[in-house]
Design a protein with these regions (language model features):
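Transmembrane-helix signature of 12-pass secondary carriers
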Residues: 1-454
Length: 454
């Protein structure tokens, strides 16, 4: 299985395991559309702080879900949680639909975040265990890139639905889009097998062999994962251990840029419709609801550049030095936002501002959004890899939560211009940290295409 060509079973595993990434991005996009609708239907409207708190609720759930379900799945097996997570997302989304109230929206977003966080803790393992050696890095990247489909599909669907319904009170119906994705996720996993890597780690090589044959066919023999040590024989490495013996540079190199990227992906991503209206990029409309529809339409167009960004990044994965890709990605993101800022301040034509926004999304996803995901497994040893990647991801989610929490406050304090300036500064910081620490931590000769948790 390590050297075989790709076949249908490989693509099936990638498609099924990628649904969590797709649904997570879809939920983030949906929250950014629902929040301005709530501002219309609620009296009094939400404060800037309340908007930020509601917006980051699902991200907090993702952080907790990744830790909790990740730990439980290590003990109980991946498959049960691979099915439980979409059930949780489905139940929480239906709760929001039937209650249509702010407290239950917050509860539902948190529960949906828990389920999606569980997905994030499992998807890359399933993919990397099944893929041939030369395709591991690429296919884990493809799973990450699938999140772009969630951004695009939900934004487009919301635009067409809102244009038909023409009523801001229907915001809760939009959550059924997440219900639909959860149903698809669940149905694709009814007939599925346990993780071969988990079975090997728990001393079940015969069952692992059967799982591999289920996924790839009866003619396939199990590969290098059979040589993994049993879980009880592996050295224990905690986050404190990563700060000893000169490992601090690794933590800075993987953690700080991921946190900086989180502001762009989630802070700007979640509040894109709000930011578009604050920048005056939507067409002049008579009512606030029509302005929301116009902003969602432009959000859809901008989101279309997320997918080409990921594709560009995947094409560069095995060709460019990863530190260079991430550094230039941050710099070009900042340049795109600088164009957007100049267009806003100088009242330049709208198309110039939109080009800046699209450039930001293109290079964000070609560089930092993809690279921060695949760099941690390359710089940590097998014993440190799980803890190292987990700590880097925690930095990323903290950056995302901070971004979503503070974007509405920045809009209140200094308008869209302040949001853009802060975001440019954060991305320049990400470029600086990557450039300074990257060459020391990850020399060119040490790049290893094995993005997995062992």
């Amino acid at each position: 299985m390590d050297d075989m060509p790709l076949r249908r079973g490989h693509f099936r595993v990638v498609a099924v395991a990628s649904m969590g990434q797709l649904t997570g991005a879809a939920l983030a996009t949906l929250v950014g559309i629902i929040l301005p609708m709530l501002q219309i239907v609620r009296n009094p409207s939400l404060s800037s702080l309340a908007q930020g708190l509601v917006g980051c609720t699902s991200l907090v759930g993702i952080m907790i879900g990744a830790m909790v379900f990740g730990a439980w799945s290590d003990r109980k097996g991946y498959l049960v949680f691979f099915r439980l997570c979409p059930l949780l997302v489905l139940a929480a989304s239906l709760l929001v639909f039937f209650t249509a109230d702010l407290p239950w929206l917050v509860t539902g977003l948190f529960l949906m975040g828990l389920g999606i966080g569980g997905e994030y803790s499992l998807d890359s393992d399933y993919i990397s265990e099944i893929m041939p050696r030369r395709w591991k890095l690429m296919m884990v990247g493809v799973a990450k890139a699938s999140s772009s489909l969630g951004n695009i599909l939900v934004a487009a669907a919301c635009f067409f639905l809102l244009r038909e319904w023409h009523d801001p009170h229907t915001w809760n119906r939009l959550v059924l889009l997440i219900s639909l994705l959860a149903v698809i996720m669940l149905l694709t996993r009814i007939r599925f097998a346990q993780s071969p890597g988990w079975l090997i780690a728990h001393g079940c090589p015969a069952e692992a062999e059967r799982a591999v044959k289920y996924f790839l066919g009866p003619d396939v023999e199990i590969g290098e994962i059979v040589r993994r040590p049993a879980k009880k024989d592996r050295p224990k490495v905690g986050w404190r251990d990563l700060l000893r013996g000169g490992n601090g540079k690794k933590v800075i190199f993987t953690g700080i840029p991921w946190a900086c990227e989180g502001l762009g992906v989630y802070g700007i991503g979640v509040f894109m419709p709000v930011l578009i209206m604050a920048l005056g990029l939507e067409s002049a409309s008579e009512t606030p609801f029509l302005r929301i529809i116009d902003s969602v339409k432009l959000t859809t167009y901008i989101n279309f550049f997320i997918l080409p960004g990921f594709i560009l990044g995947l094409l560069l994965v095995n060709r460019w030095y990863h530190v260079r890709t991430q550094t230039w990605g941050f710099l070009l993101c900042a340049a795109g936002l600088a164009v957007l800022y100049a267009a806003y301040m100088l009242r330049l034509p709208v198309w110039i501002a939109v080009v800046g926004f699209m450039a930001f999304e293109l290079f964000l996803n070609a560089g930092p959004h993809l690279m921060t995901f695949i760099l941690p497994p390359q710089i940590y040893s097998v014993a440190e890899r799980g803890a190292g990647a987990g700590l880097a991801a925690a930095f990323g989610k903290l950056g995302a939560v901070a971004g979503v929490l503070f974007i509405p406050l920045l809009l209140e304090w200094g308008g869209a211009g302040l949001v853009l300036l802060v975001t440019v500064g954060v991305h320049l910081l990400g470029a600086l940290v990557t450039f300074v620490f990257g060459r020391a931590v990850l020399p060119r000769r040490r790049e290893r295409p094995e993005p997995r948790r062992d």
